[in-house]
Amino acid sequence: MAKGTAKGAAKRGKIKAEEPASPADASPRLPAGRHGLPREFITQNQRERIITALVDTVAERGYNATTVAHITKAASVSRRTFYEHFADKEACFLAAYEMVADHIRASMGAAAKSFGEWPQQVRAALATMLRFLASEPELARLCMVEPVAAGGEIAARHRATMQDFVRILKAGRPEHSGERPLPEATEETLVGGIVSLIVREISAGRSAELEKLLPDLVELILSPYLGTEEAERLARTDAAPTAD
């Protein structure tokens, strides 16, 4: 990634699928009184502060215990200002979630393109995702743990995002499924298992150690397609994926 942290960019609403780079963390507070700033700047500044506040508050309290009042207090904005930008807490969370998910998708795609073969692409994409989640524990919790607890539209959106990973794995079927066709639920099962392991580590406060899971996860993913021996060899390879 470019200079700055992904956490700051995501919390300020700066992460874009086509622009995974990020600026500095802190969102400046507007001075009180008549400041003479353009309305568009004020509006964007407020929105970024609200998203920043949501990420911080959800990391501290969890989604279900977080209220609009908590968010507005942390963002130093009024309830009226909050509702000018978001219909409710769920809409605010979804805005933050989508920015993080878009960033992860773009970073994984860029990493995969550095390799010509599908198995190496899978490894590079997974390594990039784990590195991002390990470096941004608040965002890791936001996009991997809280959606399940939140339920409703947030959980549905999260399930849809996980289907992106299912499609990545299904792309390897034509060349790597062997003589016997794989069960239809193979990719769903693999992604579900990987997500469960990642969520377990994040929930236990071990986000910083997520990259240690890479060899085991790569072997788990590739074994049905390549066989245990080849999957283990690729899992232990020191091939360096592109930076996120």
Model-derived features: positions:
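Short, basic, alpha-helical segments at the C-terminal edge of helix-turn-helix-like DNA-binding modules
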Residues: 68, 97-105
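Amphipathic alpha-helical packing segments from all-alpha helical-bundle domains
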Residues: 152-175, 184-196, 212-220
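Hydrophobic alpha-helical connector segments
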Residues: 109-138
